[in-house]
Amino acid sequence: PEHGQLAVMAKAVRRAKSKLAGGIELFAICELGLVKSSSATNGMWTLTSSRIIVFYDQLMLDYDRLQFGYEAIKQISRLSSAVDTPELCQVLAGVLASLNSRLIDLRLVKTWFSLHLARLKGSELNLLTDSNGMKLVEGVSYDYDIAEQAFVYLDGGGRYDTETIKLLRLLSANPASILARLKIENETVLTNALYLASLAEQSG
């Protein structure tokens, strides 16, 4: 992860007798051996060895989890061309590990991913103050202004309650391992948290 995005050439990796066969999987963390190729290959690296450390095979048994796994990899790959940080790898590994456990609600995984991706993009959701700079108060419901990217206080109350904001704060401040300990039964809270996290991620 400390090297960022690399262009790698894997020769004959799908041949049955290849020493690389079975050592590369999309939904896996692998230990790779790489050598710098000649200038004739435009500075690409050549894969010389590969060993699977963790294989997230269970997520492939569920279509929705599989599709989101593809989407997460695509988004991290796209962002890695602009943002150079090992945390991208950490976020992706956390998402894949969570998707691999069918006991974890998929909406929680999506919410966690969107929140952390938004932070890496520089569009982190403001969960401390409202549009007027006032501290968010427990027991008060707020609306959300997409243009200002901030919660808005209304005299009659808003759509997003304290439980939604608490969940977003918890997910924002913790690694993906926290998801295995959460059981959110309030469907509205889950739906609203995912919506707000998605807004933050899309604005980045």
Language model region names:
Residues E2-G204:
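Non-catalytic alpha-helical scaffolds and adjoining flexible linkers that form interface surfaces
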